[in-house]
Amino acid sequence: IYSHFGVADICYVCIGALIPIAVTGGFHIDGFMDTMDAFHSYKPREEKLAILKDSHIGAFAVIMLAAYGLLFMGAFSQIINDKAFIVFCAGFFISRCLSGIAVVSFKSAKSDGLLFMFADTAHRTIVRAALYIQLALCMAVLFIVSLPYAVAMIIAAALSFWYYYVKTKKELGGITGDTAGYFVCICECAMAVALGGVSFII
């Protein structure tokens, strides 16, 4: 579509990468940066949790955000097929469904904070079931749109979800509000890479 209107590739990539940030106000990016600072501090668990509360930006947050941006934009530049783009857009819904599932399923690293409050008061079974149903319906539609792209993206999302569980449990003993944003970012980037790879191959 973008090529039909004569939009340059670099413009397509930059605007495409900016839209999710503009829509959310960079809320998830903030969590990603805080989490990167904590993970790359290589300090004891308690100090990592303290770093998550620190409003200052560390060097590793900036470095990893730059790396993330380059990887995401590079992958997005390969998504030039209309069906791949449709599947890519659905990825934002999938990442948030999985993030919600994690909130009501994974252990919280702290006994305070917004995430703990939400998880503690939520009707876990009902919320989890609702999210799984929405996720299943979304995947069913994607299978109809394009089986190869849908399979690639779902595998990437599942691997991201598994990595998120293992990494946060090892580093922090559970998840926090910041790591929820971190997960959304890595999940969306992984899905973009998967779709970009499949687009390049086929």
Q: PLM features: what roles do these ranges have?
A:
Residues I1-M33, I86-G91, Y149-K170:
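Membrane-embedded alpha-helical segments that form the functional core of polytopic membrane enzymes
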Residues S3-H4, G25, A38, D54, ...:
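Transmembrane helix-loop junction
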Residues G16, P20, T24, F72, ...:
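Alpha-helical transmembrane segments of multipass membrane proteins
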Residues I19-I57, Y165-C187:
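Acidic (Asp/Glu-rich) catalytic motifs at the cytosolic membrane interface
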Residues G26-M36, L98-A109:
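Membrane-water interface of transmembrane alpha-helices
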Residues A38-K83, V87-F88, I126-L142, V184-I202:
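Multi-pass membrane catalytic core of lipid/isoprenoid biosynthesis enzymes
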Residues V87-A102:
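Function-critical hydrophobic alpha-helical transmembrane segments in multi-pass membrane proteins
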Residues S108-L115, D120-I202:
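C-terminal membrane-associated helical module and adjoining short loops/tails
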